[in-house]
């Protein structure tokens, strides 16, 4: 986030670069601030926001311009468990309703199985795709799904594949 911009200005940055009118971009951003549970923080600067709030603003900034593909590189790694679960569910909802493709990078197998339709495992130098695991779980995917037998079987399969690749 740009430290000299408010949370709203940061969220609207991509739309601003695309030439969207100020009223249009602020309307879209404020709607997403409400949806992501951070309404009322639009005027705050990054140093005034928690790590979770900053991640929500970054997620809004990514989705607001509706790109064809959004790269998310370990966006939840530094978050506490509750905030991570909340943001995972918010991401799943946004993702499902937006039509935006997401390339999600994570080292967390549970997170990958919950969020992704397909897991690609990388190895070697430079990193190349060495294995793939489709995730045929139905959507929507509530956090409680992580306790279902099918989820746990998929997780076991991914972990076994990772062990196989390591050996």
Question: Where in this protein do the model-derived segments appear?
Answer:
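Signature (C-motif/LSGGQ) region and adjacent switch/coupling loops
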Residues: 8, 42-45
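Conserved ABC ATPase "signature" region
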Residues: 12, 16, 23-41, 93
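Conserved signature/switch motifs of ABC ATPase nucleotide-binding domains
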Residues: 44-47, 65
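Catalytic Walker B motif of ABC-type/P-loop ATPase nucleotide-binding domains
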Residues: 70-73
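Helical segment within the ABC ATPase nucleotide-binding domain
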Residues: 84-98
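Conserved H-loop
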Residues: 99-105
């Amino acid at each position: 986030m740009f430290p000299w911009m408010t949370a709203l200005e940061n969220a609207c940055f991509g739309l601003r670069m695309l030439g969207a009118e100020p009223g249009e971009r602020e309307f879209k951003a404020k709607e997403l601030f409400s949806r992501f549970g951070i309404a009322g923080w639009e005027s705050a600067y990054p140093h005034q926001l928690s790590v979770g709030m900053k991640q929500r603003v970054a997620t809004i900034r990514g989705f607001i311009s509706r790109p064809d593909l959004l790269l998310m590189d370990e966006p939840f790694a530094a978050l506490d468990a509750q905030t991570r679960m909340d943001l995972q569910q918010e991401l799943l909802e946004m993702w499902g309703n937006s039509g935006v493709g997401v390339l999600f990078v994570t080292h967390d197998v549970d997170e990958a199985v919950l969020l992704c339709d397909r897991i690609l495992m990388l190895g070697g130098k430079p990193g190349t795709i060495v294995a793939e695991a489709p995730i045929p779980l139905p959507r929507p995917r509530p956090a409680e799904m992580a306790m279902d037998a099918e989820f746990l079987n998929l997780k076991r399969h991914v972990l076994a594949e990772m062990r196989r690749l390591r050996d």
